[in-house]
Amino acid sequence: MSVSYNGGLTGLTALVRNNLVHYQQWSDVEVVPLRDREALRGRPAQKLSNDDEEIGVEYVLPVELSQYRSSGVTLEALDKVFSQLPASCKRVVLAISSDDGTVVYYTVYQGLQRPRKN
């Protein structure tokens, strides 16, 4: 989706940004330009994991469902994304959008993540 609106953002980035701000109630959401795509960063309304001590800045990678299905989201592609983000970023939230505008979120961690203790 390369339609441009909402201040020059691509349609996908604008869709995910609006979903984060208006439905998920994130604050301070802004675009992070990467080499070959756009990401977003912002503060969620609540912690994304029980392991988090406090609410911090999270990075979101908008992805179309067709990219996800066609293996456009590979470990290599995610490594490239992590290499362009601050070293303190240990996870990225994938925002997968379908053709009807529905957005679902999945968390992807950099490297291996130990299972949490109950």
Curated annotation (Swiss-Prot):
Keyword tRNA processing: yes
Keyword tRNA processing: yes
GO CC term, one of those recorded: tRNA-intron endonuclease complex
Keywords of the record: tRNA processing
GO BP field: tRNA-type intron splice site recognition and cleavage
Superkingdom of the source species: Eukaryota
GO MF term (any one): tRNA-intron endonuclease activity
Disulfide linkage: none
A Pfam family assignment: Sen15
Entry similarity comment: Belongs to the SEN15 family.
Subunit structure: tRNA splicing endonuclease is a heterotetramer composed of SEN2, SEN15, SEN34 and SEN54. Interacts directly with SEN34.
Protein's recorded name: tRNA-splicing endonuclease subunit SEN15
